[in-house]
Amino acid sequence: MFRQSVRRFATAALRSAAESPYNVRVSQAQGFVNGLTEAIGNTPLIRLKRLSEETGSNILAKAEFQNPGGSVKDRAALYVVKDAEERGLLKPGGTVVEGTAGNTGIGLAHVCRSKGYKLVIYMPNTQSQGKIDLLRLLGAEVYPVPAVAFDNPENYNHKARRHAESLDNAVWTNQFDNTANRRAHIETTGPEIWAQTGGKLDAFTCSTGTGGTLAGITYYLKQASGGRVKSFLADPPGSVLHSYIQSGGKLVERSGSSITEGIGQGRITDNLQPDVGTLDGSLNISDEKTIEMIYRCLDEEGLYLGASSALNVVAAKEVAEKLGKGSTVVTILADGAYRYADRLFSKSWLESKGLRNAIPKHLEKYIVLP
């Protein structure tokens, strides 16, 4: 019995770490994963050193850009497909249909390719050719359609639904109102944050588009902490959610726009609905603050972030300042800047958006594109 116990202990120790030929300790805690879908999640939680020192707090950011598809949306993509499989709506050789303008489509393309499903994407025809080409490269069938409001039957989401209904063995995954999206973050992202912080966090903040990330993580952290952990919405210009929360639940007509993509909303989605009333507040983050933080994170932290990630970091900084020194605030780095570099680091684009002067002089060296 003793020898068996020792053997089990030694085996566990071997799994947890190994010596490399170069005397570097190499972790083997996770071992290999079985295919792309098992590589989704378990992303690092990074302490942003400069901002943490500046605020006297711990500002922690979850590196979702390290998912296989490059964004937090990989989690939702996997869960909406798994949900369709579990409910018998999707069988081998079937077709997944979604209306998406961005990262959810890329996540679905990776998941569907790995599982052997066909993927059809409807998106507004305002999207870049590069994004369309990437989805097609990943095996998706892409239909760019005129950009119209959600209440118009020709909206890209409604076209996606009708396309799925016209096929056998097909499912419209409906990322905005399919609560499997929220469940992905209740079952994965939330528990990961809780474990990575040892439960020692004071607040969480992030922006929202479908509502799944904010709602799912908020639900889990409030349940795990007995309501102690606060949660704040970070909202870009052009979204109605900040005013909805500040007014106590009054929806106004959406107006304005933002440089951010995939976040902001004109309605309360089914993913957000269960948890919007439990939020502790909201912050409206200007494009000027967002673009400056993109450049700051690159310069100070070596992090190459997309606009929604930078907006989240601004919000985390403001929440930390609100809570005071010694607080721990967690946010989400939704994706990197790789898909947006031709704009975010372009002098002409920044000038066209009136954002050139938002970049501090010492950071202008990163404006490397004409």
From Swiss-Prot:
<keyword id="KW-0028">Amino-acid biosynthesis</keyword>
<comment type="function">
    <text>Catalyzes the conversion of O-succinyl-L-serine into cysteine, the last step in the cysteine biosynthesis pathway. Can also use O-acetyl-L-serine.</text>
</comment>
<keyword id="KW-0808">Transferase</keyword>
<feature type="transit peptide" description="Mitochondrion">
    <location>
        <begin position="1"/>
        <end position="16"/>
    </location>
</feature>
<feature type="binding site">
    <location>
        <position position="308"/>
    </location>
    <ligand>
        <name>pyridoxal 5'-phosphate</name>
    </ligand>
</feature>
<comment type="similarity">
    <text>Belongs to the cysteine synthase/cystathionine beta-synthase family.</text>
</comment>
<feature type="modified residue" description="N6-(pyridoxal phosphate)lysine">
    <location>
        <position position="73"/>
    </location>
</feature>
<dbReference type="Pfam" id="PF00291">
    <property type="entry name" value="PALP"/>
</dbReference>
<dbReference type="InterPro" id="IPR001926">
    <property type="entry name" value="TrpB-like_PALP"/>
</dbReference>
<dbReference type="GO" id="GO:0005739">
    <property type="term" value="C:mitochondrion"/>
</dbReference>
<dbReference type="GO" id="GO:0008652">
    <property type="term" value="P:amino acid biosynthetic process"/>
</dbReference>
<comment type="pathway">
    <text>Amino-acid biosynthesis; L-cysteine biosynthesis; L-cysteine from L-serine: step 2/2.</text>
</comment>
<dbReference type="GO" id="GO:0005737">
    <property type="term" value="C:cytoplasm"/>
</dbReference>
<keyword id="KW-0663">Pyridoxal phosphate</keyword>
<keyword id="KW-0496">Mitochondrion</keyword>
<feature type="binding site">
    <location>
        <begin position="209"/>
        <end position="213"/>
    </location>
    <ligand>
        <name>pyridoxal 5'-phosphate</name>
    </ligand>
</feature>
<dbReference type="GO" id="GO:0004124">
    <property type="term" value="F:cysteine synthase activity"/>
</dbReference>
<dbReference type="InterPro" id="IPR036052">
    <property type="entry name" value="TrpB-like_PALP_sf"/>
</dbReference>
<dbReference type="GO" id="GO:0006535">
    <property type="term" value="P:cysteine biosynthetic process from serine"/>
</dbReference>
<keyword id="KW-0198">Cysteine biosynthesis</keyword>
<dbReference type="InterPro" id="IPR050214">
    <property type="entry name" value="Cys_Synth/Cystath_Beta-Synth"/>
</dbReference>
<dbReference type="GO" id="GO:0141223">
    <property type="term" value="F:cysteine synthase activity, acting on O-succinyl-L-serine"/>
</dbReference>
<feature type="binding site">
    <location>
        <position position="103"/>
    </location>
    <ligand>
        <name>pyridoxal 5'-phosphate</name>
    </ligand>
</feature>
<protein>
    <recommendedName>
        <fullName>Cysteine synthase 1</fullName>
        <ecNumber>2.5.1.-</ecNumber>
        <ecNumber>2.5.1.47</ecNumber>
    </recommendedName>
</protein>
<keyword id="KW-0809">Transit peptide</keyword>
<dbReference type="InterPro" id="IPR001216">
    <property type="entry name" value="P-phosphate_BS"/>
</dbReference>
